[in-house]
Amino acid sequence: MKRIILITGGQRSGKSSFAEKKAHELTTSPVYLATAKIWDEEFRKRVERHQKNRGPEWTNIEEEKELSRHNVAGRVVVIDCVTLWCTNFFMEFDSNVASSLEAVKKEFDKFTQQDATFIFVTNEIGWGGVSENKLQRKFTDLQGWTNQDIASHAD
């Protein structure tokens, strides 16, 4: 049975740890789908350290945008995080919010057609007030609308 869970909060608020704990409550063999773009060797080492710290029971997947490329049917999967996932589309579409949002929604719908338990982790970046930076305001809008869309599908 498909299930969508959305975990949101501020930066460093414990969202990922909470999501991992929730996944462990639901299965002994969870999937961790990380959406971060690996920019350099230092970050690659950080990713490897996080994978090792999660333990051997986890299936680790690195995927910047096309989550639906991965068959997670029948699994419990933590998607961490929506903010970085949106960033990847935002950069691909040259900061065009409408195009980015359309692509994110399309990929979300395609990915979540699978019969799985999806635990999406996202940041609430809009609580910090309105930025003076136009690019940041555009991204905050994209993030907020994406969070609303995922929340509308969540159980």
Q: Which residues fall in each region the model found?
A:
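A short, N-terminal amphipathic alpha-helix
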Residues: 25, 57-73, 105-113, 145, ...
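Helix-adjacent hinge/juxtasegments
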Residues: 56-102
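Conserved P-loop
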Residues: 4-71
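Residue-level signal for inorganic ion chemistry
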Residues: 19, 50, 78, 123, ...
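Conserved nucleotide-binding/hydrolysis micro-motifs of P-loop NTPases
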Residues: 37-40, 83-84, 124-127
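Generic beta-sheet signal
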Residues: 3-7, 30, 75-84, 116-120
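Catalytic phosphate/metal-binding cores of nucleic-acid and nucleotide-processing enzymes, i.e., regions
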Residues: 1-4, 11, 73, 98-102, ...
